[in-house]
Amino acid sequence: MVTGGTGFLGRHVVESFTKKGYQVIALVRDIQKANKIQQLQKAKIEHCEIYNKNLSYAFPVNSILIHCAWGDVKDSMSPNHLELNLPDNYRFIKNAVEQKKLSRVVISGSCYEYGLKYGPVFASSSTKPNTPYAIAKVKLHKNLVKLQSKSNFKLTWARLFYMYGEGQDENSIIPLLKKAIRNGEKKFNMSYGEQLLDYMPVEIAAKQFLSLIEIDPGTYNICSGSPISLRRLMEQIMSEMNKNIELNLGYYKYRKQDSIAIWGADPLNQIF
């Protein structure tokens, strides 16, 4: 069972599992939107208002819940992460595990939980969140660990690094670059592009969830382990498109809440 199936990551997680022959139920709030998403076509799509306080959804016996849903992901500084997303997501997951029908719960976390770390980080590295989004994720993780002592369920926490690909928000930097190239623009405004970050195609990140349901529960980084500068990634995208555009470096300042260099030190393919 996958929540957030119409989202950027969720749709690719659903497709990864259906391609491997799993029976997948995609819990969505917008059936019409879900029916238009190619990656969901082999899944069973069910309407579910997961944040409804009166939700009475019955989970199938021995099912696996992969929770990708989260609101306001475009704005990491929104107070809604702590005021709405944290309690709403905890209530939904608590309700799910207390039915005692789930064999495992996999939750999508974020590398932003580490805060302004510089360099490689392990899944065991300390967290120091510095945005409402990251703080809410860390608190949810801690609350679920406490809940385990009462409800005894298998919990896997997956900290995602930087992803790109089909379904990404059109206002993210890579879709904006592609749009500028398609529109024949001469320049593309960006920062200096010196950020050294752990980027991976969303399809590869989604496939790693297949491993997460088979290995021991715990906390893992969903990462490539190979950092690349943002400027180099932009050049790589242009090369793949066989197009060129002048990168107007330094037009934007670096965001104070974002790490200038962070990558996962323990990708799953090196652990197992």
Protein language model regions, located:
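Conserved glycine-rich Rossmann-like NAD(P)H-binding loop of the short-chain dehydrogenase/reductase
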Residues: 22-32
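N-terminal Rossmann NAD(P)H-binding glycine-rich loop of SDR-like oxidoreductase domains
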Residues: 1-20
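Active-site helix of classical SDR
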Residues: 132, 136-139
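NAD(P)H-binding glycine-rich loop region in Rossmannoid oxidoreductase-like domains
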Residues: 48-85
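NAD(P)-dependent short-chain dehydrogenase/reductase
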Residues: 142-197, 202-206, 236-238
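SDR active-site strand-loop-helix element
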Residues: 3, 27, 68, 105-111, ...
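Conserved Rossmann-fold NAD(P)-dependent oxidoreductase catalytic core, especially the SDR/UDP-sugar
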Residues: 90-132
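C-terminal substrate-binding subdomain of Rossmann-fold SDR/epimerase-dehydratase oxidoreductases
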Residues: 183-272
